[in-house]
């Protein structure tokens, strides 16, 4: 198959692993810088151009779109979709998962466990907002934050009010969430491919750090999931419409709580922690689905 990977940096671990694994399985793998693509949106003949040339119609697309380029990246992915390329994660699903508020509203509607969460725009709602999620301590998150950036733990109601007022003062959109103390600064990353959890790791925050992101000095070990944790991860991926994603869970006294569904999960941490060939599993999914009827190809439904 001819497969295109959208990535800003071909030297990143995940991009390199996908290219190596794809070529080892006999596929043609092209890595294209998302922001250097441009589109010809012509009636009946949509194309993507790159470095002065028209790109071919690929069999499949693996989008590695960073949060900072979500708008343009999903536009490029959507252009490939209307050309008839099978996208492992449809552009609309990526957009859905990147909007933290929208994704939580969708998960909430389907009864997925989540930390109690509040959202507001006016300062006069702050006291009740904090009270409504259970009171301090609370976690305050920027809607646009990634890798633990823009996430603050407020230990007291007064501190929480000050932080929320400061964010509102700069017109930032924020979520206010209950703090799951029993999680102990750890979360679980479930890697879901094709409706199955294929690997899972427990990420522990560095000493004195409540955020468990590996980018912030956290560590990771393989973990065994409970049945309900596995089902929660699979259902969250399905609700987002993602075939390949990372679902982050917290273990709480009332069951697993979904923190985020990541449409472009990194492979280095989970391959290292579990010893599993995740990149190979991505291609197994593509090969199986590309053998199905052409009606399965994504066409960009909005």
From Swiss-Prot:
EC numbers for this chain: 6.3.2.-
Q: How is the cofactor bound?
A: Binds 2 magnesium or manganese ions per subunit.
Q: Where does ATP bind?
A: 141, 178-179, 187, 211-213
Q: Name one Pfam family in it.
A: Rimk_N
Cite the binding residues for Mg(2+) 2.
260, 262
Output the Gene Ontology cellular-component terms: cytoplasm
The record's annotation in InterPro entries points to:
ATP-grasp, ATP-grasp_RimK-type, ATP_grasp_subdomain_1, RimK, Rimk_N, Rp_bS6_RimK/Lys_biosynth_LsyX
An example of a GO molecular function for this protein is: metal ion binding
What family does this belong to?
Answer: Belongs to the RimK family.
HAMAP family from the UniProt entry: RimK
What is this protein's record name?
A: Probable alpha-L-glutamate ligase
């Amino acid at each position: 198959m001819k497969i295109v990977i959208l990535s800003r940096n071909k030297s990143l671990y995940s991009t390199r692993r996908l290219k190596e694994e794809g070529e080892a399985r006999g596929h043609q793998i092209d890595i294209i810088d998302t922001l250097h693509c441009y589109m010809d949106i012509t009636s009946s003949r949509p194309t993507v151009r790159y470095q002065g040339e028209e790109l071919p119609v690929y069999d499949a697309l693996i989008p590695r779109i960073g949060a900072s380029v979500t708008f343009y990246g999903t536009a490029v992915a959507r252009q490939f979709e209307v050309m008839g390329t099978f996208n492992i994660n449809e552009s609309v699903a990526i957009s859905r998962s990147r909007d933290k508020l929208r994704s939580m509203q969708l998960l909430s509607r389907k009864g997925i466990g989540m930390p109690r969460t509040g959202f507001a725009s006016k300062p006069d709602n702050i006291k009740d907002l904090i009270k409504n999620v259970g009171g301090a301590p609370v976690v305050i998150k920027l809607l646009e934050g990634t890798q633990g950036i823009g996430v603050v733990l407020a230990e007291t109601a007064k501190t929480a009010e000050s932080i929320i007022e400061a964010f509102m003062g700069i017109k930032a959109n924020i979520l206010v969430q209950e703090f799951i103390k029993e999680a102990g600064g750890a979360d679980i990353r479930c890697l879901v491919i094709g409706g199955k959890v294929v690997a899972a790791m427990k990420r522990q925050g560095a000493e004195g750090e409540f955020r468990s992101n590996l980018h912030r000095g956290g560590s990771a070990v393989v973990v065994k999931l409970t049945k309900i944790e596995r089902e929660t991860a699979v259902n969250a991926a399905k609700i987002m419409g993602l075939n390949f994603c990372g679902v982050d869970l917290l273990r709480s006294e009332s069951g697993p709580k979904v923190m985020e569904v990541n449409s472009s999960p990194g492979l280095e941490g989970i391959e290292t922690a579990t010893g599993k060939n995740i990149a190979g599993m991505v291609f197994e999914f593509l090969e199986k689905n590309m053998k199905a009827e052409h009606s399965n190809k994504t066409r960009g439904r909005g």
